[in-house]
């Protein structure tokens, strides 16, 4: 059996411990490595000729990407999980206790357990490469750093900085890591090992303490000051998580107890809290999302199909969506993009949009001006069909007008090659209808981005009846290169995300018309776990956009999609939402941004002809909206719009911010129990009508007591 850790000795007395997990592209820590590492550490202790130790990775671009998450699924009880954490503590404590200097030479991802391993070393040096990132992202899986990270990190970089890293899971770039004292030096990769060896030869076992501001010294250096930090952090966490995520509060407690009662006590608390989180339903749900997205990355979207390489893209339309799509094509995918618009204003908008995003990166020192300019050079513009013939994919982002899209299809088939893919960014028009104008319908596909394009992770890849497998696979690969999470859905009104969102939004509108206040509605759904409430979302998306999509969904899918008639009054009053500074909420004059203290525009109640009454329980408000979404998600599965419950969960979480701690609509139905969900729907059906009728599959599952997972 191949070893993961190999120890070599240099003539100068420095030993090099290389980690290289056999058969894997990245290093991850596994429970079975414990005895192997302990044996090597014992060997080092016995060998008096070893003057220092350097830890380095044998992988090309990865130090240690973290612990192997699948280990956690093997834990049957909290006791098993606690033993796992304690095993890590023993090994890392042993490494830290070596009486020779130990230096971590870091290149590539150094995350989670990988950073905890580096923290147990006496010093750290990392490469200045863009691939090098350091962080503890465990909170994103509903966990906490369980290998001593909650104790060593605050002692190294300070409590405030450590809490910020652990509570957000943010990844730190090399220069930032040096500034905060997380690493002792940053050097080019070519001299990384040499520098680490020199540091080990210098014989220092402790690093210089990081300089702290006077305020930080006062806060972190006294029990009273530390309590202020912890209390403030706890308040912020409670506000942000709405009590839905247990990990952040436990992270704060680990640091608090460790700083008050010492490292040993802190490690004990860390192991206990880690164990509780591993077996929590929230972490199980978040880990299921992680595994689902990892699994999806290996799929082409069309079984047996090989994607063609996309060397050039054309984007039709220089508006908000077109500019965003062009931007992620050049900056993320590094693919040349040519933007075509009928007027120069649209083109300058697209260029300005991309430049502003890149310039933010320069201002934050994430890139140099030269890198920004090189990426901008990948974007070119035209008002005519010039320089488009060699495009591999054309993404259409023009108005939602079928005749216009038909014209675009004909233009592209005339101007481009026979294999050029025509991908429409429509949010509502069926792709099959757009493809009716094509002589090569196999090349036509939907590619539905969400706004703002650079922030929203999901894209829906929509195949109509004649879309070829190669077109699907190529489009999926293209979306992944843009940094997106693509789900393949079948053609149909609203596709998947907008279809399940529409009923949720409609129900919120019904509640509003029944007298629930706007603030109460939004607060109820934020408390449930959505990033924003439904009324805020309607203002953001645009009331006019909602009004345009609703009749299409009603025509194709039936009466349950009928939007409340009262909403026509909003458009008559020229209320489109944030885009024109007039919607449900008040907006600061001129910039269309919400007022600092977000306030409802009370005049909207008069426009709708309603008067807010007594607010219902938040849980009841949220339930009515959410069960509509759950019921429709199952209908989408039955209709073949989505291929699996897994895809439905990913689409809802990454497309509309369905609460990740619930694992997605299908995971949540399993948690509730199909029988319980059917009872809730039937109760509402009796009270409010057939829009709540449970779909056939849910009724079957309720009767047979079956689950999706």
Swiss-Prot record:
Listed HAMAP family: FadJ (MF_01617)
Subunit structure: Heterotetramer of two alpha chains (FadJ) and two beta chains (FadI).
InterPro entries associated with the record: 3-OHacyl-CoA_DH_NAD-bd, 3HC_DH_C, 6-PGluconate_DH-like_C_sf, ClpP/crotonase-like_dom_sf, Enoyl-CoA_hydra/iso, FA_oxidation_alpha_subunit, FadJ, NAD(P)-bd_dom_sf
Membrane-crossing residue ranges in chain numbering: none
Catalytic reactions of this protein: a (3S)-3-hydroxyacyl-CoA = a (2E)-enoyl-CoA + H2O; a 4-saturated-(3S)-3-hydroxyacyl-CoA = a (3E)-enoyl-CoA + H2O; a (3S)-3-hydroxyacyl-CoA + NAD(+) = a 3-oxoacyl-CoA + NADH + H(+); (3S)-3-hydroxybutanoyl-CoA = (3R)-3-hydroxybutanoyl-CoA
Gene Ontology terms: biological process: fatty acid beta-oxidation
Keywords: Cytoplasm, Fatty acid metabolism, Isomerase, Lipid degradation, Lipid metabolism, Lyase, Multifunctional enzyme, NAD, Oxidoreductase
Organism expressing this protein natively: Shewanella sp. (strain MR-4)
SUPFAM superfamilies found in the cross-reference section: 6-phosphogluconate dehydrogenase C-terminal domain-like, ClpP/crotonase, NAD(P)-binding Rossmann-fold domains
Highest taxon in the source lineage: Bacteria
Protein name, entry field: Fatty acid oxidation complex subunit alpha
Function noted in UniProt: Catalyzes the formation of a hydroxyacyl-CoA by addition of water on enoyl-CoA. Also exhibits 3-hydroxyacyl-CoA epimerase and 3-hydroxyacyl-CoA dehydrogenase activities.
Residues marked Important for catalytic activity (site): 116, 138
Stretch list, region Enoyl-CoA hydratase: 1-188
Subcellular location: Cytoplasm
